[in-house]
A protein has these predicted regions:
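Short helix N-cap motif at coil->helix boundaries in the Bergerat
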Residues: 46, 128-136, 150
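A conserved beta-strand-to-alpha-helix junction within the catalytic ATP-binding
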Residues: 2, 6, 10-13, 40-54
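Acidic ATP/Mg2+-coordinating residue in the GHKL
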Residues: 124
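Conserved catalytic submotifs in the C-terminal HATPase_c
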Residues: 62-76
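Short alpha-helical Gxxx[C/S/T] motif in the catalytic ATP-binding
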Residues: 154-158
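Short beta-strand/loop element within the Bergerat-fold HATPase_c
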Residues: 104-116
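Detector for a conserved hydrophobic position within an alpha-helical segment of the HATPase_c
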Residues: 162-163
Length: 189
């Protein structure tokens, strides 16, 4: 009888550890969500913040994802460069996570400056968003990642930051596959 209990023990311990790790991730996300700096608005070059974010995330993750950056050298926007870096890091990390099973993982980032706004488009070659959950992509605690891989707060927090910068963040699927996230921000000045 004790042997049977011992056999059941490891899966129970594993489940408890997995649950604790998820709780830790949720708490960390909530801390980030509640402690976002609301500092002074300042003009900054979104292209520089993007390049730094891509470099940092790809290097830290050890991913072999191929990132294509096609953005103008100057994208003048205003707000908090630190908060916007948090958004960009999250978008790049999500692309890495969703393409980890792809032998030729790719993330294409295109940017353009329009008359009054800057637009960045992030397209990966992962599975994309399940159609039935596309409208929930920015809901707090919604995630399509396996347990222990995400809290479901990253896109929600990013959406809130972008809104506070008077911008928009939209999710869609590319007709040829993969997720597309489009970030639009007003130009500085």
């Amino acid at each position: 009888r004790i042997d049977r209990l011992m056999e059941d023990m490891q899966p129970l311990i594993d489940g408890t550890i997995e649950g604790a790790e998820r709780t830790r991730d949720i708490v960390a996300g909530l801390k980030r969500f509640s402690a976002q700096d609301r500092g002074e608005e300042e003009a900054f070059n979104l292209a520089e913040v993007l390049e730094r974010s891509v470099h940092w995330v790809v290097k830290a993750s050890g991913s072999r994802i191929r990132v294509s950056l096609d953005v103008p050298p100057q994208i003048p926007v205003s707000g908090s460069a630190g908060q916007m870096q948090q958004v960009l890091v999250n978008l790049v990390q999500n692309a890495i996570d969703s393409t980890e099973r792809q032998p030729d993982a790719r993330l294409d980032i295109q940017g353009e400056v329009r008359s009054r706004s800057a637009v960045l488009t992030f397209r990966d070659n992962g599975p994309g968003f399940p159609e039935e959950s596309l409208d929930k992509a920015f809901d707090p605690f919604f995630t399509t990642k396996p347990v222990g891989k995400g809290t479901g707060l990253g896109l929600s927090i990013s959406y809130g930051i972008v809104e506070r910068h008077r911008g928009q963040l939209k999710a869609s699927n590319h007709p040829q596959g993969g997720a597309v996230l489009t970030l639009t921000l007003p130009l500085a000045g």
